[in-house]
């Protein structure tokens, strides 16, 4: 299997979206930690907690703790510090939490010699434009994502989570150092599930996305390694 970390293509983060440890470890034991990153979201973290994060870290994996912190600045400061203590590689907060919250999260990492990347979530891939209007925001989804991207960049964050179609413009505006993480990656035969803003792995490469997050396409596959190989080859 080609290593996307060596070649000029998006790196792959596997979302461990399982309801139990046994199922998660069945997949983890097939993966090479020098090739793949792992994402732990709210479901797995709620079920298995900090201990599971540490176990995966000890196996040599870089962990993206995707808890999307969104609270008052002091709470986010303390939560960010606690998360960084786990030795994670990347952590997410919600960009819509505002300037003060984002700056507090960034400040929480100052004392760490090797701080995790701090990433802001702009719009979920399940998000539709009508949803903005429902909460009183009368701009397009693209404008909304760009505004939150600028806010996060101004606050010193390392990058954003955003749908793939906005990535190219964000790279142009903020440069290559500003990391883009994109979920909603599907190859042609995959089901959409509950995601609307999706792109293919090949498009992710074209848009200069740094990391792609792949969940159900892999976790629900009968042959996840074969599927991953297919995804990597599609980006060549």
Curated annotation (Swiss-Prot):
<dbReference type="InterPro" id="IPR001754">
    <property type="entry name" value="OMPdeCOase_dom"/>
</dbReference>
<dbReference type="InterPro" id="IPR014732">
    <property type="entry name" value="OMPdecase"/>
</dbReference>
<keyword id="KW-0210">Decarboxylase</keyword>
<feature type="binding site">
    <location>
        <position position="216"/>
    </location>
    <ligand>
        <name>substrate</name>
    </ligand>
</feature>
<comment type="function">
    <text>Catalyzes the decarboxylation of orotidine 5'-monophosphate (OMP) to uridine 5'-monophosphate (UMP).</text>
</comment>
<dbReference type="InterPro" id="IPR011060">
    <property type="entry name" value="RibuloseP-bd_barrel"/>
</dbReference>
<comment type="subunit">
    <text>Homodimer.</text>
</comment>
<dbReference type="GO" id="GO:0006207">
    <property type="term" value="P:'de novo' pyrimidine nucleobase biosynthetic process"/>
</dbReference>
<comment type="similarity">
    <text>Belongs to the OMP decarboxylase family. Type 1 subfamily.</text>
</comment>
<dbReference type="InterPro" id="IPR018089">
    <property type="entry name" value="OMPdecase_AS"/>
</dbReference>
<feature type="binding site">
    <location>
        <position position="195"/>
    </location>
    <ligand>
        <name>substrate</name>
    </ligand>
</feature>
<dbReference type="GO" id="GO:0005829">
    <property type="term" value="C:cytosol"/>
</dbReference>
<dbReference type="InterPro" id="IPR013785">
    <property type="entry name" value="Aldolase_TIM"/>
</dbReference>
<feature type="binding site">
    <location>
        <position position="186"/>
    </location>
    <ligand>
        <name>substrate</name>
    </ligand>
</feature>
<feature type="active site" description="Proton donor">
    <location>
        <position position="68"/>
    </location>
</feature>
<keyword id="KW-0456">Lyase</keyword>
<dbReference type="GO" id="GO:0044205">
    <property type="term" value="P:'de novo' UMP biosynthetic process"/>
</dbReference>
<feature type="binding site">
    <location>
        <position position="125"/>
    </location>
    <ligand>
        <name>substrate</name>
    </ligand>
</feature>
<feature type="binding site">
    <location>
        <begin position="66"/>
        <end position="75"/>
    </location>
    <ligand>
        <name>substrate</name>
    </ligand>
</feature>
<comment type="pathway">
    <text>Pyrimidine metabolism; UMP biosynthesis via de novo pathway; UMP from orotate: step 2/2.</text>
</comment>
<feature type="binding site">
    <location>
        <position position="215"/>
    </location>
    <ligand>
        <name>substrate</name>
    </ligand>
</feature>
<dbReference type="InterPro" id="IPR047596">
    <property type="entry name" value="OMPdecase_bac"/>
</dbReference>
<dbReference type="GO" id="GO:0004590">
    <property type="term" value="F:orotidine-5'-phosphate decarboxylase activity"/>
</dbReference>
<keyword id="KW-0665">Pyrimidine biosynthesis</keyword>
<protein>
    <recommendedName>
        <fullName>Orotidine 5'-phosphate decarboxylase</fullName>
        <ecNumber>4.1.1.23</ecNumber>
    </recommendedName>
</protein>
<feature type="binding site">
    <location>
        <position position="39"/>
    </location>
    <ligand>
        <name>substrate</name>
    </ligand>
</feature>
<feature type="binding site">
    <location>
        <position position="17"/>
    </location>
    <ligand>
        <name>substrate</name>
    </ligand>
</feature>
<dbReference type="Pfam" id="PF00215">
    <property type="entry name" value="OMPdecase"/>
</dbReference>
